[in-house]
Regions:
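RNA pseudouridine synthases
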Residues: 1-342
Length: 342
C-alpha cells in the first residue's frame, strides 16, 4: 500500500538537504527514504523528481511516496472477520479506531497468538485488501473494554505514539469501584477532579501484579522520570499520575471517570486499590469481597473498566479527533438499575 506525504519546507529548514528534512520533519527512517528514492517520482520537490542531496528553500513543496516493504506487511494470523466482526468507531486511510470487547487481548501474547483484537483487525484488513501491518497505539488489558486505536502506516504510528508520550493523545475511562468515597474526598462536589501520584512497581510475590508505593503520600512525582528511592529499598519505581472524578456514590460502590498522565501497567487498578477502592470484578487485586455488601454491589464477571473516550490530532492534517465508545451491556445494566446516565 502506497502513502503520499506532502509538506511545505519551513524557514528554519532552509539550506538543509531533502534527506535531512525528511528525517527530521517527518520522522522517516533511512530505509523508508531509500525505498522511495528508487521509485519513479518517489521523491519530488515542487512537482519535479529530485535527489535526496538537493538543498531545500523556504516554502518548497516536498512529496514522498511511502511504500510498505514486504516485511512490513501484515504478518498476523487472521480471524475470519465475518465470524468476529469489529465495532468500528472511526476509519480513514491512516488510522482505525475500534471498540474492544472485554475478554480478549489487544495483541498476541503467550498462548494467545491467533485470538486477539489485533488478529481481528488483521482479518478485517485482509478482507478489505488493505495490506499493512497491524499497529496498535497503546493497549487495553484483557478484561478492559473500550477504544483501541490502530495506525495503518509507520508514519502515522510514529506520530500518534509521540502524541501519546507528550499527552496530546489522551483517553478517558469509566470504572465502577468498591466502597463509597469519604465526604472529605468529594467535598468539592462530583464535578471536582482529584489526583493520585503514587509511584508503581512490580510486586515480588506475583508475576503479573503491580503495587503502589504510598510512602510518598500525595506528593508530586515527575511524570517523565523513572527513579530510584531509598524508601523502596533501592527498587526502581515508575512514576504514575491518575486523575479521577466521582460521578456516583452509594454506600457500597461508586462510579468514577479517570484520566491518565502516564500509562503504566494496571495503573488505574493499582491506584484505585491504593485508595481503598479496588475495581469491581478485579480478582487480581481484590481476592475477597466484603460479605455484608455483596448483595448491594453490581455483579461484574470481569474488571469493571471501560476506555470511554479518546482525543488526538490526526497524524497528517492535524485536525482534532474526538471519539466515544458506547458502554458495554454490563455497564448499561448497572446504570439502568440506578437510573444513572453519563
Amino acid at each position: 500500500m502506497e502513502k503520499y506525504i506532502t509538506f511545505a519546507v519551513e524557514e528554519h529548514m532552509t539550506g538543509q538537504t531533502v534527506e535531512k528534512v525528511l528525517r527530521t520533519a517527518l520522522g522517516l527512517t533511512k530505509r523508508q527514504i531509500s525505498r522511495a528514492k528508487f521509485q519513479a517520482d518517489g521523491i519530488r520537490k515542487n512537482g519535479v523528481q529530485c535527489r535526496t542531496t538537493d538543498i531545500v528553500q523556504t516554502s518548497d513543496q516536498i512529496m514522498i511516496c511511502i511504500e510498505a516493504a514486504k516485511n512490513d506487511l501484515n504478518h498476523l494470523v487472521s480471524f475470519c472477520e465475518d465470524a468476529h466482526p469489529l465495532e468500528i468507531l472511526y476509519e480513514d486511510e491512516d488510522i482505525l479506531a475500534v471498540n474492544k470487547p472485554a475478554g480478549i487481548l489487544t495483541h498476541p501474547s503467550g498462548a494467545h497468538y491467533a485470538d486477539t483484537l489485533s488478529n481481528q483487525v488483521s482479518g478485517y484488513f485482509h478482507k478489505k485488501k488493505v495490506f499493512c501491518r497491524v499497529r496498535p497505539i497503546g493497549r487495553l488489558d484483557k478484561e478492559t473494554s473500550g477504544i483501541v486505536l490502530f495506525a495503518k502506516n509507520q508514519v502515522s504510528a510514529q506520530r500518534l505514539q509521540a502524541q501519546r508520550e507528550s499527552g496530546i493523545l489522551h483517553k478517558q475511562y469509566i470504572a465502577i469501584v468498591m466502597g463509597s468515597f469519604s465526604d472529605d474526598t468529594s467535598a468539592l462536589s462530583n464535578t471536582a477532579w482529584h489526583t493520585v501520584c503514587f509511584p508503581i512497581r512490580k510486586t515480588a510475590d506475583h508475576p503479573l501484579r503491580m503495587e503502589a508505593i504510598t510512602d510518598f503520600g500525595s506528593s508530586f512525582v515527575p511524570e517523565s522520570a523513572d527513579f530510584v528511592t531509598p524508601l523502596a529499598g533501592m527498587t526502581t519505581l515508575l512514576s504514575a499520575v491518575t486523575h479521577y472524578q466521582i460521578l456516583y456514590r452509594s454506600p457500597d460502590w461508586s462510579i468514577v471517570t479517570l484520566k491518565l498522565d502516564t500509562g503504566r501497567t494496571h495503573q488505574i487498578r493499582v491506584h484505585m486499590k491504593a485508595l481503598g477502592h479496588p475495581l469491581l470484578g478485579d480478582t487480581l487485586y481484590q481476592k475477597t469481597f466484603p460479605a455484608d455488601s455483596l448483595s448491594e454491589q453490581p455483579v461484574f464477571h470481569r474488571t469493571a473498566l471501560h476506555a470511554w473516550k479518546i482525543q488526538f490530532r490526526h497524524p497528517f492534517n492535524n485536525a482534532w479527533i474526538s471519539l466515544e465508545a458506547p458502554l458495554p451491556d454490563d455497564f448499561c445494566n448497572c446504570f439502568q438499575n440506578i437510573n444513572f446516565s453519563l
